[in-house]
Amino acid sequence: MKFPIETPRKQVNWDPKVAVPAAAPPVCQPKSATNGHHPVPRLSISSRATVVARMEGASQGGLQTVMKWKTVVAIFVVVVVYLVTGGLVFRALEQPFESSQKNTIALEKAEFLRDHICVSPQELETLIQHALDADNAGVSPVGNSSNSSSHWDLGSAFFFAGTVITTIGYGNIAPSTEGGKIFCILYAIFGIPLFGFLLAGIGDQLGTIFGKSIARVEKVFRKKQVSQTKIRVISTILFILAGCIVFVTIPAVIFKYIEGWTALESIYFVVVTLTTVGFGDFVAGGNAGINYREWYKPLVWFWILVGLAYFAAVLSMIGDWLRVLSKKTKEEVGEIKAHAAEWKANVTAEFRETRRRLSVEIHDKLQRAATIRSMERRRLGLDQRAHSLDMLSPEKRSVFAALDTGRFKASSQESINNRPNNLRLKGPEQLNKHGQGASEDNIINKFGSTSKLTKRKNKDLKKTLPEDVQKIYKTFRNYSLDEEKKEDETEKMCNSDNSSTAMLTECIQQQAEMENGMVPMDTKDQGLENNSLLEDRN
């Protein structure tokens, strides 16, 4: 249960962002050693009222955080699973014992009725019901009730009032009258908040005491150059051990001695009481067969008060741990995602840059290899052609060179251009000797251009060549065409956009052609145009 308070209590929370600013003793909060990491949060000694103080401080500062629905549903599912698991375990442990008790009671009732024939089963059931009602009213049906102490004497009534405002509610005694029930309602409404203020104050004092002790322990470990995280863990363990010794172990030993319980029953009662569960199956000072001292029950209630403050501090500390762990987990997950995204971007950029460099290098190497292969093929072709020409006779070599380099084309063109003048100057004997004057004029009139006539003359000349020369010419002609096709395919595969390499290849090709005696196409076309102009003038 949460208790409202007027002012935020002094505390040092695990989470620096959520912690309420409060003035704490300087001894309890020594300066943490800066080691390059985030400061480790300090343990808090707080009670259930701390939750209300934190909520008030957050609402005043406008920084109140609301839990998301997904988180609420997840926690609800976890709680339901936890409840189902607990129910299954309790049923497996307690149901066999309950069945055995039922069988035992049934056998004892049957044996009693068999031994006491004068008692009817209805009378026995009525007696048992009266005993249960008396027990529920707080009167023990065991023994002589006139000699035992009353459940509503001053000590017992004080203890009952303490169980009401502490919300423990053992249930061993309860008001039976209407006036008592009405007063219990009003008493709980005003007494529970009042006890909450008292519990918060005691929690502050316990926090101060334990804070000073923890600060001394941290000072000792800090001199030994122990890491801050280890110091926090050690101080937490010492805090829990000290509380367990003071509020659990020592009271359990006392209850075992006074109440006659076993060690397990004593520890069970202590934990159930300080966690405000209060089943009521074991109650200190509830045994009618024991004569308790008058101060026993008030002392038990004072132990409950201080023990509740300690357990509230422990529960609050556990809640702070879980909250800090969840926030740290979220921050670590966010950092991991950010690092992963940054690493992915860097790897992608490096991969793209590497691929671009490799593509450029491979492209350059392919282009250079294509150029080198083209030059080697041309050089090999020229060497083979020169070797073949060396094997021919001088006459065939001159004819083949004239056909290959285009010199015959120029000489035949000059003869054609000069043919009309020769026909005019020379006599009829020479015309009859050659017998070609009229045929050449007909050829000029028929084709109408010197270029067509030149091509025709070349074809006629090729027909008159010997067969061995024609075969050699065709072989080298096909070889040249194959070389040109291979060069074109290589250029298409390379997809070269570098104009300098193309110009270099073209210059090398033109130079090789000029060395072999071949006339460039531009020069050939220009020569044809000049010859046409001279022919028109004539």
UniProtKB/Swiss-Prot annotation:
Location comes to: Cell membrane
Topological domains on the Cytoplasmic side lie at: 1-71, 203-233, 320-538
Q: Which residues bind K(+) 4?
A: 167, 276
Q: Where does K(+) 3 bind?
A: 169-170, 278-279
As its record notes, the protein acts as a catalyst of: K(+)(in) = K(+)(out); Rb(+)(in) = Rb(+)(out); Cs(+)(in) = Cs(+)(out)
Q: Which residues bind K(+) 2?
A: 168-169, 277-278
Give the start-end ranges of region Selectivity filter 2: 276-281
Where are the annotated segments for Disordered? 412-444
Principal localization reads membrane
Keyword Iron-sulfur present in the record's keywords: the answer is no
Aminoacyl-tRNA synthetase among keywords: no
In this chain, the site described as pH sensor is at 151
| Protein name (record) | Potassium channel subfamily K member 10
- Recorded source organism is Rattus norvegicus
